[in-house]
Amino acid sequence: MTYKAQYTPGETQIAENRRKHMDPDYEFRKLREVSDEDLVKVLGHRNPGESYKSVHPPLDEMDFEEDIVRDMVEPIQGAKEGVRVRYIQFADSMYNAPAQPYDRARTYMWRYRGVDTGTLSGRQVIEMRELDLEGVSKELVETELFDPATTGIRGATVHGHSLRLDENGLMFDALQRYVFDEEKGHVVYVKDQVGRPLDEPVDMGQPLGEDELKKITTIYRKDNIAMRDDKEAIEVVENIHTGRTMGGFGMDVFKDDLRKRLGDD
């Protein structure tokens, strides 16, 4: 019998959008073009054209003791070459951004190898070897996972995900890393992800618009699709909550079993 991953519960469009993100067989829709050079500028880890910094020799040049796990697992390219670890971090507006922190974490773990990811309420970081990071970042920025207005590339001072959008639909950014170009109708980055000014602005394209965001978002909202309208998702959450509460706090659920283990029949 072949097991088919379900990814996440739910019968609504929100749940389906989440499953698309996590499913490695689903190909993200490409919505914009960002050059490799521009992406490197926004990441801010190295200058365009600069060689990758290394933290150890290439694996082929290193002597290791025999290790069956190492022989079984193919290292990613950055690890093979000894490239250092770097990151990209996103903040996602609660106003129908395409992705959100836990969705990102699950998506990264399903789709990419060699990643370390950290989840907080308003931001999501992904760390990996810099060489591989740039390729992954390009996919995350050029596709439907990213909206220039409601998704922010923010390595520091990430606040803004829960604040109201401005008159152009942009999420608040205390460091003002990006601005709205009224002539083009595009969002342009004028600073890198930690707030250092760029020599030239980087065009991230046109915001997706409110109607499109409501179609592709992975966030349940009362003014779009409420979680309580998704019976299957609610049922699973309630089951988890009940199990953790009753079992975790030992409220008579395992009393008989515990007595047997202690020899108190």
Curated annotation (Swiss-Prot):
Protein name: Methyl-coenzyme M reductase II subunit gamma
Keyword match Nucleotide-binding: no
Pfam families cross-referenced by the UniProt entry: MCR_gamma
Gene from which this protein is expressed: mrtG
Sorted UniProt keywords: Methanogenesis, Transferase
Function: Component of the methyl-coenzyme M reductase (MCR) I that catalyzes the reductive cleavage of methyl-coenzyme M (CoM-S-CH3 or 2-(methylthio)ethanesulfonate) using coenzyme B (CoB or 7-mercaptoheptanoylthreonine phosphate) as reductant which results in the production of methane and the mixed heterodisulfide of CoB and CoM (CoM-S-S-CoB). This is the final step in methanogenesis.
Family statement: Belongs to the methyl-coenzyme M reductase gamma subunit family.
Binding, coenzyme M: 123
Record text on cofactor binding: Binds 2 coenzyme F430 non-covalently per MCR complex. Coenzyme F430 is a yellow nickel porphinoid. Methyl-coenzyme-M reductase is activated when the enzyme-bound coenzyme F430 is reduced to the Ni(I) oxidation state.
